[in-house]
Curated annotation (Swiss-Prot):
Family assignment from sequence similarity: Belongs to the class-II aminoacyl-tRNA synthetase family.
Gene Ontology molecular-function annotations: ATP binding; glycine-tRNA ligase activity
GO biological process, alphabetically ordered: glycyl-tRNA aminoacylation
PANTHER family the record matches: GLYCINE--TRNA LIGASE, CHLOROPLASTIC_MITOCHONDRIAL 2, GLYCYL-TRNA SYNTHETASE
Subunit composition and interactions: Tetramer of two alpha and two beta subunits.
Catalytic activities: tRNA(Gly) + glycine + ATP = glycyl-tRNA(Gly) + AMP + diphosphate
EC number: 6.1.1.14
Cellular component annotations (GO), alphabetically ordered: cytosol
Species the sequence originates in: Wigglesworthia glossinidia brevipalpis
Broad enzyme group: ligase
Protein's name according to its UniProt entry: Glycine--tRNA ligase alpha subunit
Localization per Swiss-Prot or TrEMBL: Cytoplasm
Amino acid sequence: MSLTIQDLILKLKLFWEKQGCAILQPLDMEVGAGTSHPMTCLRAIGPEPIFISYIQPSRRFSDGRYGKNPNRLQHYYQFQVIMKPSPINIQDIYLISLQEIGININNNDIKFIEDDWENDTLGAWGVGWEVWINGMEVTQFTYFQQMGGLNCFPITGEITYGIERIAMKLQNIDNVYDLIWSNNFFQKITYKEMFYQNEIQQSVYNFEHSNIEFLLFCFKQYEKEAIKLINLKNPLFIPAYEKLLKAIYNFNLLDARKAISLTAKKNYTIRLRSLTNEISKLYLNYRKSLGFPMCKNNESIS
């Protein structure tokens, strides 16, 4: 029997724990991708090593389709792996992980398609590849070159599994709502039973009923609060980063609502990127003041 989504997540956690990753919990805030988790966005900066993995609920408002599209969602799950420094054989380890969850790499058409990644609001970009299995993208590979507008050294390797799409391959189905989330002696639960109404109602809200004036007000207030926090005598860069994420959330919802012009969108992006850069520099300087304590014998410091 193929893996349920619940079993898939558990197997990925166990696999990456065996590769030396600490298993973290998802960020308890609305984000567009697992990269926004501070354990990725901030920890990718500076020389200190980090090996972590976690599941992250993600929201991309513009991808909402009122529950009518079989494989496109405005809310979905990513499994994130972060390794710094990135192992030379990280792609081989990834292929082994596919076999571990039940995907035979010899009997399936697996392609690495060049696709460099960037996130303008986070001031981030990297060299990357999409991983396609039998014609569907299921994973994004990225080697971060910059985060928060700062150069990444050593390079951080990121693997982002698309949980729903991998589960569709494993369960051999074409509609995400037919996925089996869990199956035990109490009952079998499908993705539709768990999330179908969420997709419908959130799409209606995102595209039709989100209050534009309220979203603009929230954006400005969160931006203002973040600026205040980084300008304190003893800057609070972690709360500031959370306020930045709230501002990005409102910006993305305004964009999905088509409530801002291209010129305004560019202006907001510049403001968010600048704020991310200031927070990132504060984080890096703080870690430097501690002597980069996670570097064993200063081995990663140059």
